Amino acid sequence: MASEKRILIMAGGTGGHVFPALAVAKALAKQGWQVRWLGTADRMEARLVPQHGFDIDFIDIKGVRGNGLIRKLAAPFKILRSIMQAREVIKEFKPHVVLGMGGFASGPGGVAAKLSGIPLVLHEQNAIPGMTNKLLSRIASRVLCAFENTFEGNAEVVGNPIRSELIALGRSEQPIVPDDALRVLVVGGSLGAKIFNDLMPSVTAAVAQHHSMTVWHQVGKGNQAQVEAEYLQLGQSGSVKVAEFIDDMEAAYRWADVILCRAGALTVSEVAAVGLPSLLVPYPHAVDDHQTKNAQVLVEAGGAFLLPQTVLDSEKLISKLQILASDRKALIEMGQLAKSVAVLDATERVAAVCIALASKEKDD
């Protein structure tokens, strides 16, 4: 154990935190690093991280933003306890570097790393940093981010780590055949997006009156039967595939000509990496409206249309899809422009920072 470099990774809660962290974890593991995870037992990292072959420790911590008075009064004591729990993990594992990539465990874990004298690397996936990373950026050894102007100060823009399989997808090399049906991928996240489920059946029927279009619609848990019935009622079932989840997103990205989706940081980064034109509808209740800021990167490059949910209706969606269906050259150009802002070596950049900091630490 003395000659093997060790990293403790803190990431959890959502796929937007966990999947980029897994990409870095796998890159370091391939180089012989021992990887251990710090998370919470009731969030998705508890299931996903062991599935990918990494050990995980849990601390007791919840979010404090927007909760009631009693929970806020109790929060300092709970945070102190979770910091102590994280220090115990660090004391036992003896990491050379700690990497925080978001989620409830990152706050206590980051403070514990500082108290333990372990270099702390932060990575912020969103264009607007979360409260925890804003605070931790003051004590971190290195601060990394995916987008320009995320932090004030000396943050390094490195992009968002994504799965190597998506980088190798090569979607942009596959020409769009003008006479083919427009292939629309609709992705609303694990719970689906109600507005997509409500609008797309009638939108598909309207566009189909003038253009050939096929739809692959991910509707979220418990919504499949109802959405399928709506497509069927409008005579569109033959050109639509409805699924609660899409397990193989690589296949979905490869299939699609355009995607209708939210604007989470990971989604925006993946869409750019595969060169897929997009219709972005930021989640309107995201903290600090960070999804709108995420979307601007692709929109300003010309690789996406921004459709704020507050003004989105069937007519606007029909109009955008008809434009794309009738102008395949513009669709191809959008994909190329999306690809132009992709950062394809983000995983390696984050890993390199961790390696550089660890190299300054003596082996135990």
From Swiss-Prot:
InterPro entries: GlcNAc_MurG, Glyco_trans_28_C, GlycoTrans_28_N. GO terms for biological process: carbohydrate metabolic process; cell division; cell wall organization; lipid glycosylation; peptidoglycan biosynthetic process; regulation of cell shape. Its EC number is 2.4.1.227. It catalyses: di-trans,octa-cis-undecaprenyl diphospho-N-acetyl-alpha-D-muramoyl-L-alanyl-D-glutamyl-meso-2,6-diaminopimeloyl-D-alanyl-D-alanine + UDP-N-acetyl-alpha-D-glucosamine = di-trans,octa-cis-undecaprenyl diphospho-[N-acetyl-alpha-D-glucosaminyl-(1->4)]-N-acetyl-alpha-D-muramoyl-L-alanyl-D-glutamyl-meso-2,6-diaminopimeloyl-D-alanyl-D-alanine + UDP + H(+). One of its GO terms (cellular component) is plasma membrane. It is a peripheral membrane protein. Pfam families: Glyco_tran_28_C, Glyco_transf_28. Its main location: membrane. It is found in: Cell inner membrane. Gene3D superfamilies: Glycogen Phosphorylase B (3.40.50.2000). Pathway: Cell wall biogenesis; peptidoglycan biosynthesis. Belongs to the glycosyltransferase 28 family. MurG subfamily. Cell wall formation. Catalyzes the transfer of a GlcNAc subunit on undecaprenyl-pyrophosphoryl-MurNAc-pentapeptide (lipid intermediate I) to form undecaprenyl-pyrophosphoryl-MurNAc-(pentapeptide)GlcNAc (lipid intermediate II). This is UDP-N-acetylglucosamine--N-acetylmuramyl-(pentapeptide) pyrophosphoryl-undecaprenol N-acetylglucosamine transferase. The gene is murG.
